[in-house]
Amino acid sequence: MKKFILFLLKIVVLLFAVAVVLDVVYTIVYVNSDSRSKIDYLYNSSDKEYDVVFLGSSRVNNHFVPELFEKEGYKTFNFGITRSRLEETALQLKMMVERNYKIKNIILQVDLNINTNDHSEAIRSLFMPYLHQSETIRAHYKDIPEYNKLLLIPFYRFMYYDARIGFREMYYSAIGKKTNVLENKGFNPLANKPGPMIPADLTKYYPKRNVAYEDRKSVV
């Protein structure tokens, strides 16, 4: 019985050691990658100066063209991310402050997102590789239910968000495979023709107090 318990303890210790090693390896890869997403680009940049910065979801990502502003002499970047909510754009703005960005004008997309305090799991996952390195990210997520697990259990955050920051994404980051998200200064036009407009009655909607929106105003 003692031998069996000792064997189990060895297995647990081995698994813990493997998790620690994997956590370190994945983290090193991500903190040295700046060409896969707008979040890793933001994390690995500092002291940027812009005349105009766009923040928001696909409505920003697919529609605001920095080149048009650049032609008028305004240094511009589109930090919009498809599927992001106000919570994620608030954290982007905080990271810009943390990275000592100097921005003259910020255009924030609000629209119907003001009516929900929800978040995007897909976009939240993109911040997780830097949870240990960024005090700003830790402070932003300290109240979410899974925070302690994500912070304290080795490799847990990479397993929890495997679909977005798992092995495949880590491998592409390690070999320096770029995506197109940073092309055109962050502007990503829709490739296909837009479908028909969907009729919607917006009269039932009205602005509500949004925690992330208030958070963004306090940063600005």
Question: Could you say what each language-model-derived stretch is?
Answer:
Residues 27-49:
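Alpha-helical transmembrane signal-anchor/signal-peptide segments
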Residues 123-220:
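Secreted/periplasmic serine-hydrolase-like ester/acetyl group-modifying domain
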Residues 34, 85-88, 215-216:
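Soluble or luminal CAZymes and related metallo-dependent hydrolases
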Residues 6-26:
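Hydrophobic membrane-insertion alpha-helices, especially the h-region
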Residues 22-29, 75-83, 204-214:
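Acidic/glycine-enriched edge-of-secondary-structure segments
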Residues 1-2:
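N-terminal hydrophobic targeting signals that begin at the initiator methionine
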Residues 55, 59-147:
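Membrane-embedded segments
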